[in-house]
Amino acid sequence: MKKVKKLLCALLIVLTAMTMLSEPFQVPVQAARTVTANKNPNKAVNIKKKGTYRVLSKTKMNKDDYIRFTAPKKGKYTLTFSDFRKLKGYTPSERHLGSVYIYKNTKYGRSMQRVKTNGGKSYTLSICSKAWYNDYTKGKKIKAVSDLHTRYAKISLKKGETIYIKTFWTGGKHSYSLKIK
């Protein structure tokens, strides 16, 4: 019995020491920030930092919605869109399509931008659900107009310049992941 108590005490001391030593080396996990898109581009949420965002779209089926991004400094930015899905009742077998458009204010008004993306340059970023991609696109040559589950857009911006990101999704209310770097 004494051996068991000594063993338990030794184990407790070792575990306590490990906990105390490992705590300073832990990296905090940062969850994706959630933002809600708006059907009015002028009232859309304005993202001002790089990072990963979960964007919620509460507009009805076949309606556009917007978010904005204002560049914190001059440079090339990569926007990665992925994991498009319905907000409620999502099943992995659903097949939906959508589009992403990027607009910038110019001296002539708001203008759609041609951006570098998977497979070339395009004004329209065609996106789809994972099931659609697996059934119809996977294994084919990727073109700028291909329906992809994950798609990037590269754009050069000046400090303080704002882009408007418009999405359209056939599944109605939806969400997606947006990574800005």
For the regions a protein language model found, what residue spans apply to each?
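Noncatalytic modules at the cell exterior or secretory-pathway interfaces
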Residues: G75-K76, K154-T170
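A short beta-strand element within beta-rich, extracytoplasmic domains
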Residues: K76-K86
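Signal that preferentially marks extracellular ectodomain short beta-strand elements
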Residues: K140-I155
